[in-house]
Regions:
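A conserved catalytic-core segment of Leloir-type glycosyltransferases
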Residues: 1-38, 56-122, 196-202
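Conserved donor-binding/catalytic core segment of Leloir-type glycosyltransferases
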Residues: 40, 219-241, 247, 262-263
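Nucleotide-activated donor-binding/catalytic signature segment of Leloir-type glycosyltransferases, i.e.
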Residues: 266, 270, 275-308
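Short alpha-helical segment that forms part of, or immediately flanks, the ligand-binding pocket
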Residues: 306-307, 330-334, 348-349
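Aromatic "clamp/platform" in nucleotide-sugar-dependent glycosyltransferases that forms part
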Residues: 321
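Short hydrophobic beta-strand element within catalytic cores of glycosyltransferases
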Residues: 329, 338-341, 351
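Conserved acidic donor-binding segment of nucleotide-sugar-dependent glycosyltransferases
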Residues: 353, 357-364, 372-377
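A short, well-ordered alpha-helix in the C-terminal region of glycosyltransferases
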Residues: 372, 379-393, 400-406
Length: 414
């Protein structure tokens, strides 16, 4: 059997402290209508990255509503995850010529077949996350559950050969969900296609309230000079997050803001073998400057430390060049810390209005925005507060639960 991630049950009513009552009431009402429904999310890693981040909070909340919710994780060797990482990149526009080779396709297909045989299928609804397990439905054609494919990446301009390979598997699902309409490939032929943005849990260890002086003390313990300015990027060690562009923008900004420090805080996940090489390359660049710090979940920087970085930093940077959503943007804004971010993917959803002035398209523009905000902290503070309200109204977990429960209800006919 596949691994089931061990999680408990949360209390949906906690959200009444931070969320509009009508949203919580609707979520509870939908839960009552679907009480006893067996729901299973499937992905490729129990930790690291946005999907795992979502499910850790999402599954316990679903259970609190009376939904029998589980989370199963597919298995794979390094070869399989190297292929699926390439598929992930190709959905975002990178080339993957090896997909034309029969042995590459067989590797993907055989792993999905093996995982299909080990999957606990005793559920009413499956939600399959991203390309890694996208072929499971194909190998379980006799299963009577409803199947939803959830795409978390920017698939607006996928590599044509990869899309042609994956599309038949995706089209066997009963519904597909994308973060935003512009991510939906025009050739996808599924009757039920919808959009919904991811969300954050304000009560998780990464987002819970921590006093500012405690956060600053944590950064002090990690070697930062808390009497100097700090900017931080939190992300996977991934090419699409443009860590080298962030370093270049920091160096340009430092010419006008002497003493500026940069933290690059990342995470590793079992389904991302590429991240090790990226981490090594980032480290090689960082050692040239004593004011660049590289930290990860393997060096003791977990969710609480990320929380501290996002609260104690003077600015958060998220210079992505492709981005499905970028949960770290919502996380930082929830803490009233302004973000300078790449004008990519789902990030603009989180930064409307005046915040959109800090969406950037180049290293130079990123550096200019960093300098302006560091020299005008009152502007950063005002917009940080505005950002928190945007997150409260649009990107808390209750809104995601409502959207998914509405979709599930429409599929199961209740």
């Amino acid at each position: 059997m596949l691994q089931k991630v061990s999680l408990g049950t949360a209390d949906i009513n906690k959200y009444r402290r931070v969320e509009a009552e009508d949203i919580v009431d609707e979520v509870v009402s939908l839960g009552n209508e679907l009480k006893g429904l067996r729901l299973c999310h499937i992905n490729s890693t129990p930790f690291g990255g946005g999907v795992a981040e979502l499910l850790v909070s999402y599954i316990p909340l679903m259970r609190s509503l009376g939904i029998c919710a589980d989370w199963q994780v597919i298995r794979g060797d390094r070869r399989f995850f190297t292929i699926t990482k390439a598929l992930h990149n190709a959905l975002q526009g990178a080339s993957f010529e090896a997909i034309e080779q029969p042995k590459t396709r067989r590797e993907y297909q055989n792993h999905n077949l093996a995982n299909a045989r080990e999957l606990d299928t005793n559920y009413d609804v499956f939600i399959v996350n991203d390309p890694q397990p996208a072929a499971l439905r194909h190998y379980l054609a006799d299963n009577n559950a409803k199947w939803i494919w959830r795409c978390h990446v920017d698939s607006s301009q996928p590599d044509e050969a990869v899309w042609d390979f994956l599309r038949p598997y995706i089209e066997q699902h009963d519904a597909a969900v994308f973060t935003t309409e512009k991510f939906i490939p025009k050739s996808l032929n599924i009757t039920n296609i919808t959009t919904m943005a991811p969300a954050i849990c304000p009560f998780s260890s990464k987002n819970m309230y921590i006093k500012k002086h405690v956060c600053r003390e944590m950064l002090d313990n990690l070697g930062f000079d808390i009497n100097r300015l700090i900017i931080t990027q939190v992300s996977r060690f991934d090419r699409w997050k443009d860590p080298f562009g962030t370093i270049d923008a920091y160096r340009l900004a430092k010419e006008k803001v002497p003493g500026l420090q940069l933290a690059l805080v990342g995470s590793f996940a079992p389904d991302d073998p590429e991240s090790w090489d990226m981490h090594a390359a980032i480290n090689a660049e960082a050692i040239k400057d004593d004011d660049i710090f590289v930290s990860s979940n393997l060096t003791g920087v977990g969710n609480m430390e990320v929380n501290a970085f996002q609260r104690a930093s003077d600015l958060i940077i998220q210079k992505s060049i492709r981005e499905g959503f970028g949960l770290v943007v919502a996380e930082a804004l929830w803490k009233e810390t302004l973000v300078v971010a790449g004008n990519a993917g789902g990030i603009p959803l989180q930064m409307p209005g005046e915040l959109s002035n800090y969406l950037v398209n180049s290293v130079e523009e990123c550096a200019d925005k960093i300098v302006y905000l560091l020299e005008n902290p009152a502007v950063a503070m005002r917009l940080g507060k505005e950002g928190k309200e945007i997150v409260r109204q649009n990107f808390l977990m209750t809104r995601l639960l409502r959207d998914e429960l509405r979709l599930i209800k429409s599929l199961v006919g209740k």
